[in-house]
Amino acid sequence: MSELFETLKSFFYNDEWFYIEVESRPVLRLNHWGENGRFSCQAEVNEEQKIFYFYSYFPVNVPEEKRSVIAELITRANYGMRVGNFELDYEDGEVRFKTSLDVENVELSHDLVSNHVYANVWTMDRYLPALFGVIYGNISPKDAVEQIEE
């Protein structure tokens, strides 16, 4: 495996994150317990392009009848977001928060990984109540985002 991937593994090991390494690709699967809930994560390296991706996954797939309101919520949340973005897969209802770092000609340090990972999981944890509220509590996307961003 590459030096980039070894840096990721070292960071997660030293920071006491349990991970499972995917055999066929430079991917780590992890879990995170935030203040608002538990969700799965994935750290991935694109070796050719020298990009580090980190994803946090909303813990349930959005029911088909709620996907349009979740798309509105995500659009409202993404507007003005400085780091990362939410994504919705309309096919299966998967919601994830993605951050990425282009590390071509840059050393991927433990500090860079830490800043990248913790910004990601903090954001997903912050928006969990909004996502759950729109899906299960019939809160409007606008109200849900306003409550989070107050």
Residue ranges and their predicted role:
Residues 1-19:
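Amphipathic alpha-helical segments
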Residues 57-94:
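Short, internal acidic amphipathic alpha-helical interface segments
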Residues 93-106:
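Beta-strand/loop substructures that line and gate deep hydrophobic ligand-binding cavities in soluble
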Residues 132-150:
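Short, highly charged C-terminal tails/helix-capping segments
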Residues 14, 72-80, 122-129:
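Short, intrinsically disordered, mixed-charge
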